[in-house]
UniProtKB/Swiss-Prot annotation:
It is found in: Nucleus; Cytoplasm. Residues 159-184 form a coiled coil. Plays a role in normal growth and development. The keyword Cytoplasm applies. Disruption phenotype: Viable, but sterile with defective development that is prominent during the late larval stages of development. The developmental defects include a squat body stature referred to as a dumpy phenotype, irregular gut, defective gonadal growth, with incomplete gonad development in some animals, a protruding vulva phenotype, defective uterus and spermatheca formation, and excretory canal defects. Interacts with mdt-6 and mdt-30. This is Coiled-coil domain-containing protein mdt-28. Keywords: Coiled coil, Cytoplasm, Nucleus. Residues 1-15, 28-45 have a biased composition (Acidic residues). It comes from Caenorhabditis elegans.
Amino acid sequence: MFEELDAEDGGEEQEMPMNVPEFGGGGEDIDDILGDAPDLPDDEYSNSVPQGAADGSIENDERRMRNDGAGSTNEDDEEPIEPTYLGDAIDSLMMHWCQLLTNVSVKAPVPPPSTLNHVKEVAEVCSKHFRDASVDVNNEFTRLGVQWEMEQPYSQYAIEEENLDEAIERQETIIAAAREMLNSRIQIYNEAHPNAGKHFTT
């Protein structure tokens, strides 16, 4: 087969011409070669480059780094808040609330208890602790309110003067309700004992 091909071609190899562009030859310029390339519109170029990226970006980064360092230094220099009875009461309340949810709630991987007595005992203990913690927080708020009224009497007087009309109206409503209750009780007693107070013994 190869012999037949050689016989047909006359034993000579034919070279195929290849057109390879030669850059830089013939006096051609690179601008002439790239002249047909599409240009990027000015609007797209302006939108693709963020404003302020060409100038001042390095200064902004340095200023941001300095501000972050100053903020972290100020946070480190701040003194911790002194512990108070109110803070301790709130921490205790949150702790017992989380304990109540953790001990009472049951998730899928955790097997349920074999008896309900265990759940009942745990719920009673956790609810009692949570109730005591709530009472402690309420008492602490009440104590702080009374302490503020004693230490700042003039501020308390100003607040009372602002709400004086409402306080008077509230007291009048309470007195009217008490009068109606007394009259109703007297009427019930007179109906039950019609001869009460009419016979005198000597």
